[in-house]
Design a protein with these regions (language model features):
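Final/C-terminal transmembrane alpha-helix of multipass membrane proteins
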Residues: 146-161
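Cytosolic-side transmembrane helix boundary signature
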Residues: 108-109, 113-150
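Membrane-water interface of transmembrane alpha-helices
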Residues: 83-99
């Protein structure tokens, strides 16, 4: 049986992007970072709502646009709306991994982890309903813009849903297990590792390392089963 070729690995600091050959401990101001991301997300969602309002004003004729240009303006507003909603939702999800809500408050936990989805519905569902009810647009424009708006609603919702929400209790458990130590993860892996020499990491040429908070921010919220077993 051929011997597996040993991969030369480099370790990358998650906070700085710098590389080195040995382990290190990195601290992160996760609370401050999460607050900044949430503020930015809300600002982007407000701008997205403004784009939707602009589309509604164009649709109702309050903001005058020539009929032959109206379809392009409406689609442009919807695209801007979509981009802003998705970017805001990604920032909100990252903030939730840094500073997650507690499951003890089920209402807050639900709202915190579905805020992006709520923003998506608010920023697209009204315009979809108004398009369907509108009788002034020509048939072609109405059909195309309605389809674009519906697709945008679906895309925004899919990108905004957090399919793996993290609770404050899960983060606390991870912090207790790891302490102030360093955890490791790879670009395409789903877990964080407690041991830089875990056999599941040995074939990765680039290994990221950082605090448990940085691992959660990178959406690596599940501990490696092999590392956990070895640590017991």
């Amino acid at each position: 049986m051929a011997e597996k070729k040993k991969v030369e690995r480099e370790f990358v600091e998650a906070s700085t992007g710098k590389t080195s050959k040995g382990p290190a401990v990195v601290t992160a101001a996760n609370k401050k970072s999460a607050t900044g991301k949430r503020v930015a997300a809300v600002i982007l969602w407000v701008l997205a709502l403004a784009a939707e309002v602009g589309a509604i004003l164009m649709l109702n004729g309050i903001w005058y646009i020539k009929e032959e240009q109206k379809m392009y303006w409406l689609i442009g507003a919807l695209v801007i709306d979509l981009i802003l909603v998705i970017i805001g939702s990604q920032l909100w999800k990252k903030a939730n991994r840094l500073d997650p809500a507690s499951k003890q408050s089920s209402v807050k936990f639900f709202l915190w982890n579905n805020m992006g989805l709520i923003a998506s519905v608010i920023c697209f569902l009204p315009i979809v309903i108004l398009l369907l009810a509108n009788k002034d647009l020509d048939g072609k424009t109405k059909k195309i813009v309605t389809v674009v708006a519906a697709i945008a609603l679906v895309l925004a919702s899919l990108f905004s849903i957090d399919f793996n929400p993290v609770s404050a209790e899960e983060l606390a458990d991870a912090q207790q297990a790891v302490g102030t130590g360093t955890v490791y993860w790879t670009r395409f892996g789903k877990s964080y590792h407690l041991d830089p020499n875990c056999h599941t990491l040995m074939r990765s040429s680039k290994v990221y390392r950082g605090t448990i908070e940085e691992a959660f921010e990178a959406n690596r919220t599940d501990p490696c089963d092999f590392c956990a077993l070895e640590q017991e």
